[in-house]
């Protein structure tokens, strides 16, 4: 006989909010790998990437990213499902792309679980906000070009009456701006940054599917990047890096070419 399912009177199982990293399985943490093996159920969305999801047996995988017909699964359902499984004594991994606490709604889920009396543990992951630009050859800081970095979401809560992102303040910082999930809103914030005083020729790099086998990188400026996005067909998930550091990739490729090296 298999292990009996715990009753509601038994201690609940633990929910682990696990960051899977930017997509390359080799960039997952050792602890994340171990928990995926030990978990009874893995609740995931699409961001962990096909190579990582492919390592999880189908029998213990549940996709809470989308429903049939393409609609997003409501957050309320995910919250409810985590609690339901934990109260049945299951060890649950809530698998997220990147890091659970970087625009991943990990904070909201942690509070909900605590409110319901469910043990919860956070397992940090390598955030795509840093790893994505890194694998594309775009440093976020550089002694000659940027001494600060700002991370911004390009996909805010649609119920907000107005954006909480102050593009004018970001334009005035002079550092690097990294926009996650920002492909769709690119025209709006590129225009907002120029209107706020950023030079139209400020370099921009778009990194699509960072660290995945089909990763692509496109570069331009605030003035040209929307046309570049459309021409190259850059689609989500993608990261935008705005600032002088975004030109580093092309400089390095030119140096390698002139030196006879491989890009």
Label every model-predicted segment.
Residues 1-25, 30-126, 131, 226:
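Class I S-adenosyl-L-methionine
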Residues 2-4, 9-15, 87-92, 148, ...:
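A contiguous loop/helix-start segment that scaffolds small-molecule binding in enzyme catalytic cores
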Residues 3-5, 99-173, 216-219:
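Class I SAM-dependent methyltransferase SAM-binding "motif I" and its flanking Rossmann-like core
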Residues 19-20, 28, 39, 44, ...:
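Short, functionally important structural connectors and interaction interfaces within domains
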Residues 31-34, 56-59, 77-78, 107-111, ...:
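Short, glycine/charged-enriched secondary-structure capping and boundary segments
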Residues 60-66, 117-121, 140-150, 197-206:
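Short hydrophobic/aromatic-enriched beta-strand-loop microsegments
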